[in-house]
Amino acid sequence: MPMGTHLFLFMLLGLGFYLISALAAKLIPAIDFWIDIVLWVGAAAYIFSHLSFMDGIVSLATMFYCYWTAMDLIVSERVEKPSGDWQEIELAKNKTRLLSDITLTAIVFAGAVIFFIYGPDTSPLKYVILLGMISGGGALVKRILNVFSVKVFYSAALEKLHISSHYETRTYPLSDLKNIQLESTADLLKLHPLLTMYSSRLDLTTSFQQVIKLSLPGETLFLTVKEPQKWKTILQEYTDAENNVDNVISVLPFYHRKNVKRLLGKLYFAASVKGVSAYALLVLALYALHASPWVMAVAVILYWVFNMYMSDRVLRAAMDAKSCHHPHVQAAADKIFRSAGISHVRIYETESDDYNGMAVGMNVGRSMVILTSATLTLPQRVIEGILAHEAIHIKKRDVLSSQLLRFLYLGAVVGIFLLFEQHITHPEAHKIALWAFIMAIIILFQLYQSFCSQWMEVRADNLGASLLDGGYKQMAEALRILAVRQDEDIQKQSAYSSEAGEDELQIDSLTRDKSWFFRLIDFQFAPHPPMYWRVGTLLSNKGHGVLKRWLRDRLKESITLK
């Protein structure tokens, strides 16, 4: 596997190709597409004529990854302030806030970087780490440029708030503002993207002064303004007074002794679940002890099993989940779980503007259901439908099953590659066939994951309906209301983007898509069947032959053009 200087050269080539492409698009747009084609075909021909097949694949993939990362980082020029009467809100800025982000990122990646420097060059893990560093480095660059460029404008006449930075441009109608709160300082453990999951937060904090938190449909905005109390008073006029918290919410620094447990839990999540630093250090330690590849493989599998066992605690820490204190929700959950024949299931809530609920834990005795704060605002019968759906996931051990099925597929792929290594002595003679095989493995993995996941979702919908007083009708109505709320938030978020222009995104997940291609994606690659299908089958089939119908419709909707 190419490493060191050679792989760094291919990274630079990927970046260079994007710069040439961007320059061509600006100077000679009529032929910029063909310039891209010539560059990539020429690069592929050169690489495969000078490197072995697998080294060529790795090198070309590295170039592609750097190309797309550069495309994400280099954006077109944005309008700093829209036309009209706007007042700039002065932001509090200091270097410490940005240095804290950089430090936490370095800590999370430390194990991976150590392995990349000292680990064996032949290890495929080095390539995985390299891609992770490219992605993480790109995200960090975006964060740095956002901090230096962010500006906030307010218009009393238009009743709007405008956010402008190098990568983020939003215009918010203040009529959409749900509530506004002040926090004593920036909560890094809540805002840093490597330490969270399923987050809809837009972190534009630029100091450790008081943070103004604005909740809007589908997203929450965090800013550090110089006069937070003044701007809270102004913006509070646009919200429902009942939803606002008058006092300043106390936030402890991430290094505070009372935050140590929370910090360690999030770092463990970042290093073991969201990243590979922990696995990298484990493999490096065994490599230093001259352990055999089989010992390394067994150790990695055992650590993976340990992480599955600890998944409930790890994810609870990552999501800052707290025990649910809504008596009506807890009472409904207890009733549903008794009907499902399961016990010791805890209900937690996490702060998020996404309408979502998830089952967590690898076995019934250590399971929990986490509901977002947005979900808890839904009608009671909708929450009951979500709880019933998650109860079936827990009863059928779907979280554990999905992990084992994924591991089974990856194990089969590794076995096939080992057979190839034994029986194909000259892979260069079968480049086209091997390339096609690798592409097939990637596509089949997506199909396989989607098939298993959708089967579990269909089962959870229909068996979950039997746990509800309203049966299939209540489950269908719960999914319908959930879909409507999700669609509304997506459309709002699209409208906030200044780049959306007049062609505002229209979302209706309860209507069958007219496009064959999007139906193919929905049924063959998405983790859930389309919502219109789920609601329709609950009302029409009522649990009878629904899995057969799903198999039939999965094929039919994927090949029918109309």
Curated annotation (Swiss-Prot):
Family (UniProt): Belongs to the peptidase M48 family.
Cofactor(s) needed for function: Zn(2+)
GO MF, any single term: metalloendopeptidase activity
EC category: hydrolase
Stored InterPro entries: HtpX_protease (IPR050083), Peptidase_M48 (IPR001915), PH_YxkI (IPR056388)
Membrane topology, from the record: Multi-pass membrane protein
Signal peptide positions on this chain: 1-24
Active site: E390
Protein name (record): Putative membrane metalloprotease YxkI
CDD domains with a match to the protein in the record: M56_like
Location in or out of the cell: Cell membrane
CC terms in the record's Gene Ontology section: plasma membrane
Keyword RNA-binding assigned: no
Biological process annotations from GO: proteolysis
One protein family per Pfam: Peptidase_M48
Regions crossing the membrane: 33-53, 56-76, 98-118, 128-148, 267-289, 294-311, 400-420, 432-452
EC number(s) recorded for this UniProt protein: 3.4.24.-
Predominant location: membrane
Entry superkingdom: Bacteria
Cofactor annotation remark: Binds 1 zinc ion per subunit.
Binding site for Zn(2+): H389, H393, E457
Keyword annotations of the record: Cell membrane, Hydrolase, Membrane, Metal-binding, Metalloprotease, Protease, Signal, Transmembrane, Transmembrane helix, Zinc
